[in-house]
Amino acid sequence: MSKNKYTIAQILPALNTGGVERGVVEISKALTESNFRSIVISSGGHFESQLRRNGTIHYKLDVHSKNPLRWVKIRNQLKVILEEEKVDLLHLCSRAPAWIAFPLGSILDIPVITSVHMRFRKTNIFKKIYNSVLTKGDAIIAISKHIEKSIKTVFPKVGHKINIIHRGVDLELFNPNNIKAGRIIAQSKILNLRDNVPVIVMASRPAMWKGYSVLITALSKVKEDFQCVLIGAGDGSTKFQKILIDKIIRLKLEAKVKLLKSTRDIQAAMILGDIVVMPSLTPEPFCRVILEAQALGKIPIAFDHGGASETIIDGKNGFLAKPVDVDSLSKKISLALSLKGSQREKIGEFAKKNVSKNFSHDKMCKLTLSLYKRCLAEYKR
């Protein structure tokens, strides 16, 4: 295939908050800045305005539907869009849209790339069949080595198609020098922090598997002085919050641990912290929060599994605890709190260099666009 300006269509369920959604927005911007035409098709969401600003065309379509009875109608609507826009390559970012869109690759005679953001497990045959659509493309993007391994475990014959492209951090957005004093002061008032007491931050959505309860237990064993803000826990249900608050009271941590709602300025909130903990009980596919903390020069602590194992070198740019081990997590937190200022600075500098070299937004976009170009060049060669 030879053409002056290729059109790439990314398809995903919706454009609300999440790593998949942010990745699509970032790639779409990189496409328009690199002489590609960028199309995104989804059921919509608040990221639509960002797409319009970067020159991407967005089509609203019910590609999030998991009802097979609707797929033929939606596929026909999608086919019209792809033909009218003369799309040259499809990038499918989730399972339901992939089941709808994948057949159009062969119908329209264009290459198809899929992204896998979730861990595949050896479950029942129906789940395996549902997941299998993400392995059928001309190329597969795995967002971490952990995800690559899970794909190969369940679908061993597709290993040759897998390309590991780690999710990236926007180094301008997460640059300490770019966070103005006014933003920090505003967040400081919201967090209501005590002066001269180390700050531990956990920022996540309100789900028990994210490790909120385990962290609270670990903190009860820490002898050093600290204050901890659980950002996002305050968005949880009344029942969810009650479980955590009851535990905080039972362990006599009321003066040290508080639940807060999520913030629109996570950069300013994290810059106020000394340590960022992400104690997910099950392996995270990647966990961008750990890298965002490193980009800000903070010390990340996580369990040694999933994506965290790929982004933290224990003792160099953060600390890894034994998976789901409260005592190990507590000891790592105590170790981080006991570091001298010069030791923290050394870890922070190593962390920033690690992100800049290996996990930047620019590197992610460059590798993804390079894969697009390769697939376009090789298709029907």
Language-model segments: residues:
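Short hydrophobic beta-strand element within catalytic cores of glycosyltransferases
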Residues: V40-I41, I299-A302, I312
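Active-site donor-binding acidic/aromatic loop of nucleotide-activated sugar
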Residues: G236-Q241, E254-T263, A269, F319-L320
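Conserved acidic donor-binding segment of nucleotide-sugar-dependent glycosyltransferases
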Residues: D314-G315, F319-V326, L335-G341
